[in-house]
Amino acid sequence: MARKFNSLAFIASPAEEAQKAAEDLRAVYGDHDPDKADVIVALGGDGFMLHTLHRTMNTGKLVYGMNRGSVGFLMNRYSTENLHQRIANADENAFHPLEMRTTDVNGDKFTALAINEVYLFRQSYQAAKLKVMVDGKTRLDELTCDGLLLATPAGSTAYNLSAHGPILPLEAPLLALTPVSPFRPRRWRGALLPNHVTVDIEILEADKRPVNAVADHQEVKSVVHVRIAESEKLTARILSDPDHSWSDRILAEQFSN
């Protein structure tokens, strides 16, 4: 049975095309305060959708995106017609973000959330050296690489795919641990981990080989330790058209040229 939503809130990226779309949709459907609306309609590209999901994770709000950007992997097709019906018939995907806890060279601590991935990368011309632990057990004593990332199924088609990591079905209870340009160990190309594990990464020779850490768009410089785990307290909820579902998009990506 289709759900019924009475109120929509339209938010748009600063791009002219997105702003114009918001004006057109408000003229047809009205507009509500995002805090009080049943559904938030995000207009823009994938970056804006990520930003919107970060804003709504602690509220449980449903987000329906329409592409007014470039790639639009996370977005639905843009149209001003039958929007209430499209949203009522949409499939819902709900997932927990990753929580990144960092300690930097000064001992300062910082926490950030990631829907796509948490990644570490070398800050200088020298390769990073990392010690990798999973649930307290050391799995790699020393990984020499340009970087390392932990991706969710939702983020597995983004940076993770560019780094030759595996694409994960959206419903898979897995995380992809993927190295970026690994040098040693020679044959290690990553691992699939259960989504309930805690991953600790210790930066070796941090003063000589500085490393930054990023959770989606939030960057912390010169870290010495990073802990990553799924945050079960927060949930991102996204709606997709049945004929262009998120799961189908991820499947199609595995057969693209």
UniProtKB/Swiss-Prot annotation:
GO BP: NAD metabolic process; NADP biosynthetic process
Active site residues of this protein: 46 (proton acceptor)
Gene Ontology molecular function: ATP binding; metal ion binding; NAD binding; NAD+ kinase activity
InterPro entries on file: ATP-NAD_kinase_N (IPR017438), ATP-NAD_kinase_PpnK-typ_C (IPR017437), NAD/diacylglycerol_kinase_sf (IPR016064), NADK (IPR002504)
Cofactor(s) needed for function: a divalent metal cation
Keywords: ATP-binding, Cytoplasm, Kinase, NAD, NADP, Nucleotide-binding, Transferase
Record bears the keyword Transferase: yes
Subcellular location: Cytoplasm
One protein family per Pfam: NAD_kinase_C
Catalyses which reaction(s): NAD(+) + ATP = ADP + NADP(+) + H(+)
EC id: 2.7.1.23
Cellular component GO terms held in the UniProt record: cytoplasm
Primary location recorded for the protein, binned into one broad class: cytoplasm
HAMAP family according to UniProt: NAD_kinase
Function: Involved in the regulation of the intracellular balance of NAD and NADP, and is a key enzyme in the biosynthesis of NADP. Catalyzes specifically the phosphorylation on 2'-hydroxyl of the adenosine moiety of NAD to yield NADP.
PANTHER family given in the database record: NAD KINASE
Record family assignment: Belongs to the NAD kinase family.
Protein name as catalogued: NAD kinase
The organism of origin for this protein: Rhizobium meliloti (strain 1021) (Ensifer meliloti)
Taxonomic path: Bacteria, Pseudomonadati, Pseudomonadota, Alphaproteobacteria, Hyphomicrobiales
This protein's encoding gene: nadK
